[in-house]
C-alpha cells in the first residue's frame, strides 16, 4: 500500500540513521509531527475546509475533534474505526459516510500498520476529490494524548525516547520489534531514484 501512495515521508529517525550508517544514504527525516504542524497551520488559515478524522477509539476521537475545533474549524466529522483485518479490509459504513460528507481531507489516525492499507482502500473506492493523510498517532502529540513532543525533541530524533518514558509498556515492545529493521536495511538492495 505504501508503494501505491502519492507521497511518502521518511518519518522514522531510526530508519534515517540506519540508511546513513549501513548504506551511506543521506535522507532527511520529515516526521508526522512536523507535517501535521504545517498542515494545522494551513487549516488555521483555511478554516472552511472539511476534515474527516478516522480515530482508533472514542477517547482519542473526542480529543482530536476538540483540537481541530481549537484551530477554528467548523466542518469536522469523526469516525471510530473498528479493528480491521489488514488482509481483508472492508468498511462499507465508513465509505458511505465519506460519500455523504465528501470532506476535503481524510485524516487517518490509526496505527499498527493498518493506516496505509485503509488509505489505499479509500483511495481505490472513493470517486470524489479528497486528500487522504495517513498520519497514525501523530495528532496525539498535539492533543497531548501521547508523549508531549515539541520541535526540539523532534529535530534531534528523541521522540522515541520520550514515548518510551511516557508509556513504557506499549513502546518497549514496539521498539524491540522494530529492531528487525536493522537486518532488513543491511541485506536489502536499496536504489536511489532521482
Range-by-range predicted roles:
Residues 1-50, 56, 60:
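Electropositive, gly/pro-rich neighborhoods at or near active sites that engage anionic ligands
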Residues 43-71, 176-189:
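An alpha-beta-alpha
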Residues 81-87, 128-164:
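Short, flexible loop segments at boundaries between secondary-structure elements
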Residues 71-85:
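Short beta-strand elements in bilobed, periplasmic/extracellular small-molecule ligand-binding domains
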Amino acid at each position: 500500500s505504501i508503494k501505491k501512495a502519492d507521497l511518502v515521508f521518511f518519518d522514522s529517525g531510526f530508519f534515517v540513521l540506519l540508511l546513513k550508517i549501513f548504506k551511506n544514504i543521506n535522507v532527511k527525516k520529515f516526521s508526522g509531527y512536523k507535517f501535521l504542524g504545517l498542515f494545522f497551520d494551513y487549516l488555521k488559515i483555511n478554516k472552511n475546509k472539511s476534515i474527516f478524522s478516522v480515530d482508533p477509539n472514542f477517547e482519542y476521537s473526542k480529543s482530536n475533534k476538540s483540537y481541530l475545533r481549537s484551530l477554528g474549524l467548523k466542518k469536522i466529522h469523526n469516525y471510530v474505526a473498528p479493528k480491521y483485518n489488514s488482509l481483508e479490509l472492508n468498511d462499507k459504513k465508513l465509505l458511505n459516510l465519506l460519500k455523504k460528507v465528501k470532506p476535503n481531507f481524510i485524516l487517518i489516525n490509526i496505527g499498527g500498520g493498518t493506516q496505509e492499507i485503509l488509505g489505499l482502500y479509500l483511495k481505490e473506492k472513493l470517486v470524489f476529490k479528497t486528500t487522504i493523510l495517513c498520519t497514525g498517532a501523530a495528532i496525539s502529540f498535539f492533543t497531548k494524548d501521547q508523549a508531549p513532543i515539541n520541535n526540539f525533541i523532534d529535530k534531534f530524533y528523541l521522540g522515541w525516547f520520550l514515548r518510551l518514558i511516557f508509556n513504557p509498556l506499549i513502546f518497549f515492545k514496539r521498539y524491540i520489534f522494530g529492531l528487525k529493521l536493522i537486518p532488513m536495511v543491511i541485506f536489502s538492495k536499496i536504489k536511489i531514484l532521482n
